[in-house]
């Protein structure tokens, strides 16, 4: 994958750090276990949770770290206005502007819920010229459902 760190550089740094550890150098005799890896954000995940009354959008990197959260309530829509299309469009535009600021060009969309705001969010992302790689729908669908009531006989 293009967004992962080059393994060769990391292994060289790891060997350098272990040499310092063996010689009891600058690191106060503690083993070096955690190293921050740099990666470029080329692909990000957009989680859309749409209920009947609100739409929540969160942007994460490929490791699952949340970069930005938006909802219709955070865009100053309160009460019954949160379920409108305009509110979910405004939240999506805020996410898209953050993506352009961070130079994120490709998105993977993951949908949760049956609300109508998710359709508007996807439409807004397409309008703003970000490339959508995949759309995954993760709903809990009942395949047979609960047992129905006994039929009434007259």
UniProtKB/Swiss-Prot annotation:
Coiled coil: none annotated. GO terms for cellular component: plastid; ribonucleoprotein complex; ribosome. GO terms for molecular function: rRNA binding; structural constituent of ribosome. The keyword Plastid applies. Pfam families: Ribosomal_S11. InterPro entries: Ribosomal_uS11, Ribosomal_uS11_sf. One of its GO terms (biological process) is translation. It is found in: Plastid. Keywords: Plastid, Ribonucleoprotein, Ribosomal protein, RNA-binding, rRNA-binding. Gene3D superfamilies: Ribosomal protein S11. Its main location: plastid. The keyword Manganese does not apply. This is Small ribosomal subunit protein uS11c.
């Amino acid at each position: 994958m293009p967004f992962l760190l080059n393994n060769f550089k990391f292994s060289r740094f790891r060997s350098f750090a272990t040499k310092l550890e063996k010689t009891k150098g600058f690191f106060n005799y503690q083993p070096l276990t955690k190293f921050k890896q740099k990666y470029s954000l080329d692909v990000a995940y957009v989680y859309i949770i749409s209920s009947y009354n609100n739409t929540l959008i969160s942007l994460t990197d490929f490791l699952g770290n949340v970069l930005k959260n938006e909802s219709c309530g955070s865009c100053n829509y309160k009460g019954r206005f949160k379920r409108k299309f305009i509110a979910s469009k405004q939240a999506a535009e805020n996410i898209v502007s953050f993506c352009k600021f961070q130079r994120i060009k490709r998105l993977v969309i993951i949908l949760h819920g049956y609300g109508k705001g998710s359709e508007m969010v996807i439409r807004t992302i397409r309008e703003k010229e970000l490339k959508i790689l995949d759309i995954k729908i993760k709903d809990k669908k009942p395949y047979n459902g609960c047992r129905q009531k006994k039929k009434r006989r007259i």
